């Protein structure tokens, strides 16, 4: 770890920085070379973490450097910021292109990511996509996808038929990232490729186009022997927003693989498939996987059917607190609910702050006068958001019995709660 950090500090301070962020160019060749060398010598896990986060949330926006250690080198932020910019240095571009064939997969990926976000010409990318080396073709396809380079679309479509799986599958992924409907025909053909990985990438990419006319190409994949393919197909179908896939996705709720069931639940929520309500309610209460249960609760909230109140209330007693939280949150979304279940009232006193918060917000949303005391009790909660929800809920009831609780809230330590209490009292006394 110390060795890794040593290399990274050497990279970050190479070719220093310090100009305002809006004037900083992309990284030059010295900085790019130092970064790639550092990553080549560090722990593979660290390299992969940096590759994932490269360019994300790195821009320095606090000249005062608050929250930074006082002895931290000031140049490091500038070095990081330069890598969020577009590389334009011709020598850096040459180095990045030359690194696309390196043996180190992580370094290769970082180089491709930087190249994709750079000023590299379409002609150079197309040349790399046709390189004799499958490794370079795959890396170039990744670069084209990262940069969403529409000017490489035809070359990527051609690459879908590559005899090597890596470049062909990466071309499918890149076309999905580019989102150009003109690629549909090539992707429709590729879902029938002999390589499972190419079929997977192509099905995913068709989903990214969000066009219901491609349902016929992806729907059969819900019966594929590979659970990853079935899950990807379910996700893609959800994005296509076709009313013709509801029954097939409901059928996928009984898939033996948890990832497929989760994807089917999410897709049904995206489609607002109301015919799935009963099946989702059953899965919420009976599935062996808590993540599937949580997705079911969220989906039922999206579908908003009043009949889901009873199963969601039962889910408040689930052994998994995250399922309880999701159920409490979903209840607030249901339509035409006027009577709060006892389980929801009990959840407002939970020791878990998030569950208590979700339950209080749902209770306030329902506005059942029988729960007035439960909301009044939450006016003294230690959590500001809970107090605020309770005050707003009491105000919406517009009944004199809420006045004592709202009057107490006028002395709350938080000004937002005090303002809400004053407004709620105004409504109550109208």
Q: Can you name each region flagged by the protein language model?
A:
Residues 53-56, 82-86, 114, 143, ...:
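Core register positions within helices of long alpha-helical scaffolds
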Residues 26-37, 59-70, 86-101, 119-130, ...:
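Amphipathic alpha-helical scaffolding segments comprising HEAT/armadillo-like alpha-solenoid repeats
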Residues 12-90, 106:
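N-terminal leader/linker segments that initiate helical-solenoid repeat arrays
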Residues 166-177, 195-208, 226-232, 239, ...:
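Solenoidal tandem-repeat scaffolds enriched in leucines and small polar residues
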Residues 42-43, 71-73, 103-104, 132-133, ...:
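Short inter-helical turns and helix N-cap capping residues of alpha-solenoid HEAT/ARM repeat scaffolds
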Residues 1-10:
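Sec-dependent signal peptide recognition
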Residues 50, 78-80, 111, 140, ...:
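Conserved hydrophobic register position within alpha-solenoid helical repeats
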